[in-house]
Amino acid sequence: VLVSELLGSFGDNELSPECLDGAQRILKPDGVSIPRAYTSYLAPVTAAKLWNDAKARGDLKHMETPYVVKLHRHALVAEPREAFTFKHPNRSRVIDNTRYAKLAFARGEQTKAATVHGFAGYFDATLYDGPAGEVRCSIYPPTHTLGPGGEKMFSWFPIYFPLRAPVDVPAEADVEAHCWRCVGQGKVWYEWAVTAPVVGPVHNVNGRSYWVGL
């Protein structure tokens, strides 16, 4: 059994895939990993204070860096959508931890106009399959893990991916975005972009503003 506590607010943002891929060589062929799998989610978010705090730093870097934050004055513009999934142990002959997701956020009829300041990120992890079913750990809003008193688990805050410029979304209009998990020589980074209702720039190209070292 390989037990780890490497999950970040976006699931894989603290290099859990790379660390576990390296450690799984000590597992027997029938060995198991805890966690067994995790999926990240993104949702467009209205969060003027977060955006202004990043903008006040006065440079591109701070508008292309994801932040782990406790979301207070915010509103999700659409329901979260699935981004990336990782499973362990990974028995693939060639392991590739790059990922790409095209995310379509349907808002539906009678939704009001909104301003998107970035994206809120979450994760949902399956720790293991127990006698009574799957044991999970999650900050994804629909499945957020609850404590014994019914309170939401407080161990992880969401992650916030800012946009360089806010995007105004008309009433009933949908949002489309793209997100990449990139792996390069000695580093891992994310890139993200909005392509509807307007086409915006790709953020953090080649990890120029933010990356995590391997």
Pin down the residues of each PLM region.
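Class I SAM-binding transferase module
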Residues: 1-180, 184-214
